[in-house]
Amino acid sequence: MSSDNLDISMEKKYSADVDVEKAPTPEYGEVETAPLSQSSWIYRRPRIGRFKSLAYGSALTQTIIVSWVCFLCPGMFNALSGLGGGGEVNADVANDANVALYSTFAGLGFFAGSICNLIGVKLTLAIGGTGYSVYTASLLCYKHVYNRGFVIFGGCYLGLTAGMLWAAQGAVIMSYPREENKARYIAIFWGIFNLGAVIGSIVPLAQTMHSSVNSVGDGTYAGFIVLMAVGSALALFMVSPEKTVKEDGKFVHIEKSMGWKKELLGLVQTLYKEYWVLLLFPMFFSSNWFTTYQFNDFNLAYFNIRTRSLNNLLYWFAQIMGSAVAALFLDWQRFNRVIRARVGWGLVFVLICVIWGGGLAFQLKYTRKSVAESDFVVTDFTHRGYTGYAFLYIFYGMLDAIFQSYAYWIIGSLSNDTNKLAVYMGFYKSLQSAGAAITYRMDTLNIPYMNYFASCWALLCGSLIVASPVIWKKIKLTTEGIEDEIPPLANGLAVDGPVVPLKE
């Protein structure tokens, strides 16, 4: 039976009845199909001039929606954090809040994948976005009334909700694309997500360009709060995973949650049966270890507010470039997935050594004691030698994106199942946050800059070495799993090709 005849038979079948029926396909026999009257509109691709838009129910569209949620929530949060000290002169309060944030994030994040499987991606993402506006509101409040308790509460609440947001985000980004497109989807997400930080960085840069004030204004905080609230609401417009269609015409695979007890049991079973995933934990742990150093001990310590804002803009723009470079290589079909995984490991390792080696030359110029002295002059972008510092910060941003894109790609290469990837992503963000919590506390305790710098370099290199057995032994040419056995759709979408609109 041809696909054209199949489309005609489907239209006849649903013309008089909207009940779910069984439709035959050439390869798989009967598959359950959705009634046209209930679902057809989300698979249409309306024309805009000469071009067809993406179907609303396509995996790419849903990935873009998730990316815009992260653009507005953690993207704006990153823009604020990148200024150092949450935009304030004194980083101690923001550091304490971040310790609370990442400690709670680490605790809940380990179970966030199970929560996502239980209540669904859409609701998990929406709830997860609410913490960002609350946290930013607490910083605005502190600026006027010095309510330290509210800032700590804001950090705790954000830690609880952010774990949920990132578990849902990871499940979508890693399970919605086809295997050969996973790095491209990661790059699309990373580009849009960090565009939020880029645009968010322009606002304080514009406000402080001709100002001698060393902290951001009320308008900046208020703008961030509004945008973050909009981002949380945007998540409610997503299509459920089971109604989302991949590029090959298959539904995204997701199993219905069986309740809290079985979700927690599944979490334990994952660690027991796939014990080798523990070798990836140091990589997860170190993936944000360096950000406190870069934001507080590099950017905040050495530069004035307008230069920090400019550095922030360059850093997040470099992240977009870094993720694009990673995607070009990791999805390069000239080499199979095993080769890309192994060569990628070597390239990331070399980049870490080269870039952090350059950072050592900069770090030797100052200490925590020297920047605290009254005669220390913070650097402005008009000062001689600033260009070299700017390029170092750009390379730091690119390396962050490349390292995390590679980590995402490795996780996504281990499975195609949304539920399992949500659990993996919970592990990733939990351990990442545990590392961040420790580093913010280390910064509050005023450990020497050089000690912190050395720990960053050592952890990044060491974590790759520990992860190498998984990369060498567990990354296969393709991932065999339940998802790969799901029959294609027979509801007017292509049986063995890309998504086709039901109606023009």
From Swiss-Prot:
Cystine bridges: none
Membrane topology: Multi-pass membrane protein
One Pfam family this sequence matches: MFS_1
An example Gene Ontology molecular-function term: transmembrane transporter activity
Keyword annotations: Cytoplasm, Membrane, Transmembrane, Transmembrane helix
One Gene Ontology CC term in the entry: cytoplasm
Bilayer-spanning residue ranges: 64-84, 97-116, 123-145, 149-169, 186-206, 219-239, 275-293, 310-330, 343-363, 391-411, 452-472
Cell compartment(s), UniProt: Cytoplasm; Membrane
Sequence similarity: Belongs to the unc-93 family.
Protein name per UniProt: UNC93-like protein C922.05c
